[in-house]
From Swiss-Prot:
Biased composition (Basic and acidic residues): 163-185
Modified residues (Phosphoserine): 89, 93, 107
Protein name per its UniProtKB record: Replication protein E1
Subunit structure: Can form hexamers. Interacts with E2 protein; this interaction increases E1 DNA binding specificity. Interacts with host DNA polymerase subunit POLA2. Interacts with host single stranded DNA-binding protein RPA1. Interacts with host TOP1; this interaction stimulates the enzymatic activity of TOP1.
Species annotation: Human papillomavirus 13
């Protein structure tokens, strides 16, 4: 009987912890290859030639370098193709700062993230600068050579080492790929950037503008010292604009402007813009700079912004001649200051000033004060040829004085020609509001004034009845005496005299050219003066008045209102004035509401309604033959052409 296989005493002693497996050389059913020798042991001799450990020769080194160079070229070309699409992300202007556009403009917070405070050199750049990358929109070879010739040889510290890649292999590829013309182009652009870092950038832009357009920028503009001064027309010269922005600039500015004159030029700095703009609303230099910096994608200090010379014929001729050429884009209506200086007819008309036209304008607009005439007429210089001739004259003060004098003469003659009825109608036509007459009546009742007797006295006063043409309103302070009389005098277009000027011989001179008058706040001395020297005047008789620099004038006193805190009816020394002065007493204070506004409104519109409603009672009603309208022709002091009816 055969012996049992395996081990004896299994599970006893040390053998109890181990399982001994049998070594099997071949499994049942395994196929054996024909070319495999079953008797040969696996010693590893078949893997001897798998690793090539032979010495490296010179030919193999050149092959590896060539392979690395070809792979680096392929990678560099792929990166540049990707950058070509996204080159517009940072500043693409050649005037921009290269490090700023790469490090700061990609992200506003990128510049704050630093590992070292003193490190200024960037080890790796996300974007190459425009000048050293083949973006497809760079300068041509001719422009690059021209720029190098202008800027001269580069300085020692202006090299392009900071723009290369840091890896040794990539640095070699970068040096071999770029040609000599590209290196010169990068050097010229570096000189431009260094030039703009100088102290006076504005002077540099002025010089560059003259090189581009052949004339000085100051020949087209008048400088504004303040950036806050507003103007409607602006001349802007902008440098370093991307070509894609120039195509959309006109459409972007159309909603804001009424006129644009655009000129584009291309030089070594990129696109240069010269534009004359008329905005719909006046803007300051700061506002214009912010607007154009947003549209053009350039910094504000790369622009020259000033208002145009509107009085220069040379500047107007420049805009006119370039506007009709194909070098400019013009939209909107040409400004009037260009038309005025380029059309012969307008130029001849500006040299002729006519005083009669100025007087007619002042008369039609009720301007009799010299300062108002000078200011208002000067503002018409933009659209009135006679006003432009006035501004160009050296005798403006004389013309203003003569105009005011003639206008006063015409107004006084017109006023004296009218009766009181016509004058009230004339003054009422100047007021457009309807108004209400009841507040005036309510105020009189508040002062205990009977309305019917008041109308009778007012009727005699308006018509200048002798010894009835002076009404004195007396009473305590703050009862509304001056307010009531001032509102009435304002509506009737009267004058105001004051006893404070009584030391002068001419303090009664305003009565010569007045339809009605007011003497406000008459004191004891004023009543004494009137009782002594003005009895004939209050009687309604003619009286001679002394006038300054003129002869005495014989006049009849116009209807006169007097306000006073002195009641002359209670003093016997004024007994000679009792029959000459009609006295009304206002005993009650003037009422106000909680907000401090007058309870009874004494406005021009209310006085108009008062005289219109009570015209029959006051005997100032228009007659029936005048109801059909006024057929009289308006006053004209300018010789006009004959009106031909069709």
């Amino acid at each position: 009987m055969a012996e049992d296989t395996g081990t004896n005493n299994e599970g006893t002693g040390c053998s109890g912890w181990f399982l001994v497996e049998a070594v099997v050389e071949r499994t049942t059913g395994q196929q054996i290859s024909d070319d495999e020798d079953e008797t040969v042991e696996d010693s590893g001799l078949d893997m001897v030639d798998f690793i090539d450990d032979r010495p490296i020769t010179h030919n193999s080194v050149e092959a590896q370098a060539l392979l690395n160079e070809q792979e680096a070229d392929a990678h560099y070309a792929a990166v540049q193709d990707l950058k070509r699409k996204y080159l517009g992300s940072p500043y693409v202007s050649p005037l921009g700062h290269v490090e700023q556009s790469v490090d700061c403009d990609i992200s506003p917070r990128l510049d704050a993230i630093k590992l070292s405070r003193n490190s200024k050199k960037v080890k790796r750049r996300l974007f190459q600068s425009r000048e050293i990358t083949d973006s497809g929109y760079g300068y041509s070879e001719v422009e690059a050579e021209t720029q190098v010739e202008r800027n001269g040889e580069p300085e020692n510290d202006c090299g392009g080492g900071g723009h290369g890649r840091d890896k040794e292999g990539e640095g070699q590829v970068h040096t071999e790929v770029h040609t000599g013309s590209q290196i010169e182009e990068h050097t010229g652009t570096t000189r431009v950037l260094e030039l703009l870092k100088c102290k006076d950038v504005r002077a540099t832009l002025y010089g560059k503008f003259k090189d581009c357009y052949g004339l000085s920028f100051t020949d087209l503009i008048r400088p504004f010292k303040s950036d806050k001064t507003t103007c409607g027309d602006w001349v802007v010269a902008a440098f370093g604009i991307h070509h894609s922005v120039s195509e959309a600039f006109e459409k972007l500015m159309q909603p804001l402007t009424t006129y644009m004159h655009i000129q584009w030029l291309t030089n070594a700095w990129g696109m240069v813009l010269l534009v004359l703009i008329r905005f719909k609303v006046n803007k300051s230099r700061c506002t214009v700079a912010r607007t154009l910096a947003t549209f053009l994608n350039i910094p504000e200090d790369h622009m020259l912004i000033e208002p145009p010379k509107i009085q220069s014929s040379v500047a107007a001729l420049y805009w006119f001649r370039t506007g009709i050429s194909n070098a400019s884009i013009v939209t909107g209506e040409t400004p009037e200051w260009i038309k005025r200086q380029t059309i012969v007819e307008h130029g001849l008309a500006d040299n002729q000033f006519k005083l009669t036209e100025m007087v007619q304008w002042a008369y039609d607009n009720d301007f009799c004060d010299e300062s108002e005439i000078a200011f208002e007429y000067a503002q018409r210089g933009d659209f009135d040829s006679n006003a432009r001739a006035f501004l160009n004259s050296n005798c403006q003060a004389k013309y203003v004085k003569d105009c005011a004098t003639m206008c006063k003469h015409y107004k006084n003659a017109e006023m004296k020609k009218m009766s009181m009825k016509q004058w009230i109608t004339y003054r009422s036509k100047k007021i457009e509001e309807a108004g209400n007459w009841k507040p005036i009546v309510q105020f009189l009742r508040h002062q205990n004034i009977e309305f019917i007797p008041f109308l009778s006295k007012l009727k005699l006063w308006l018509h200048g009845t002798p010894k009835k043409n002076c009404i004195a309103i007396v009473g305590p302070p703050d009862t509304g005496k001056s307010c009531f009389c001032m509102s009435l005098i304002k509506f009737l277009g009267g004058t105001v005299i004051s006893y404070v000027n009584s030391s002068s011989h001419f303090w009664l001179q305003p009565l010569c050219n007045a339809k009605v008058a007011l003497l406000d706040d008459a004191t004891q001395s004023c009543w004494v003066y009137m009782d002594t020297y003005m009895r004939n005047l209050l009687d309604g008789n003619p009286m001679s008045i002394d006038r300054k620099h003129k002869s005495l004038a014989l006049i009849k006193c116009p209807p006169l209102l007097v306000t006073s805190n002195v009641d002359i009816t209670k003093d016997d020394k004024y007994k000679y004035l009792y029959s000459r002065v009609t006295t009304l007493t206002f005993p009650n204070p003037f009422p106000f509401d909680r907000n401090g506004n007058a309870v009874y409104e004494l406005s021009d519109a209310n006085w108009k309604c008062f005289f219109t409603r009570l015209s029959a009672s006051l005997d100032i009603q228009d007659s029936e033959d005048e109801d059909d309208g006024d057929n009289s022709q308006a006053f004209r002091c300018v010789p006009g052409t004959v009106v031909r009816t069709v």
